[in-house]
Amino acid sequence: MGLKADNWIRKMALEHKMIEPFCEANIGKGVVSYGLSSYGYDIRVGREFKIFTNVNSTVVDPKNFVEENVVDFEGDVCIVPANSFALARTIEYFKMPDNVLAICLGKSTYARCGIIVNVTPFEPGFEGHITIEISNTTPLPAKIYANEGIAQVLFLQGDEKCDTTYKDKKGKYQAQTGITLPRILK
């Protein structure tokens, strides 16, 4: 399994629409950087957020998630409360090849501010916007800048094609758009 370089990422984005919209340059002046890098792609966070709240005294249950757990927010800067959590989505829409797995890691700019980003792997055959989990581990409110970089995606190409892709198994988050809350298939 090999880590893919910028030339491969560019080709897959431009010829196979693996990343849309695709930013061929790495933009970093005056913003949290985003776009193509040497061995990855820095994704941007959109303007929509779901911020966790305790206003309704609910319990977070991944098997029975309720909308009352979150407050919707849209804007250029999202303030994540101290020791709190928010969901967001990428601006980019991904179409993963059947022999490629992507791993996403948080950006050091945010990590050095106590903001941890978690994104689960993009499985072979997955298609959709990526839901981003943002955790503010500090005792202070933290700013997240929409339309700027939030994490870096690394693409790993398998030595052979898997038997069953995410699309084949009709994954529960396949073709998701916007921020997708937890789902349990019944």
From Swiss-Prot:
<keyword id="KW-0546">Nucleotide metabolism</keyword>
<feature type="binding site">
    <location>
        <begin position="107"/>
        <end position="112"/>
    </location>
    <ligand>
        <name>dCTP</name>
    </ligand>
</feature>
<feature type="binding site">
    <location>
        <position position="166"/>
    </location>
    <ligand>
        <name>dCTP</name>
    </ligand>
</feature>
<feature type="active site" description="Proton donor/acceptor">
    <location>
        <position position="133"/>
    </location>
</feature>
<protein>
    <recommendedName>
        <fullName>dCTP deaminase</fullName>
        <ecNumber>3.5.4.13</ecNumber>
    </recommendedName>
</protein>
<dbReference type="GO" id="GO:0008829">
    <property type="term" value="F:dCTP deaminase activity"/>
</dbReference>
<comment type="similarity">
    <text>Belongs to the dCTP deaminase family.</text>
</comment>
<dbReference type="InterPro" id="IPR036157">
    <property type="entry name" value="dUTPase-like_sf"/>
</dbReference>
<dbReference type="Pfam" id="PF22769">
    <property type="entry name" value="DCD"/>
</dbReference>
<comment type="function">
    <text>Catalyzes the deamination of dCTP to dUTP.</text>
</comment>
<dbReference type="InterPro" id="IPR033704">
    <property type="entry name" value="dUTPase_trimeric"/>
</dbReference>
<keyword id="KW-0547">Nucleotide-binding</keyword>
<comment type="pathway">
    <text>Pyrimidine metabolism; dUMP biosynthesis; dUMP from dCTP (dUTP route): step 1/2.</text>
</comment>
<dbReference type="InterPro" id="IPR011962">
    <property type="entry name" value="dCTP_deaminase"/>
</dbReference>
<feature type="binding site">
    <location>
        <position position="152"/>
    </location>
    <ligand>
        <name>dCTP</name>
    </ligand>
</feature>
<comment type="subunit">
    <text>Homotrimer.</text>
</comment>
<feature type="binding site">
    <location>
        <position position="176"/>
    </location>
    <ligand>
        <name>dCTP</name>
    </ligand>
</feature>
<dbReference type="GO" id="GO:0006229">
    <property type="term" value="P:dUTP biosynthetic process"/>
</dbReference>
<dbReference type="GO" id="GO:0015949">
    <property type="term" value="P:nucleobase-containing small molecule interconversion"/>
</dbReference>
<keyword id="KW-0378">Hydrolase</keyword>
<dbReference type="GO" id="GO:0000166">
    <property type="term" value="F:nucleotide binding"/>
</dbReference>
<dbReference type="GO" id="GO:0006226">
    <property type="term" value="P:dUMP biosynthetic process"/>
</dbReference>
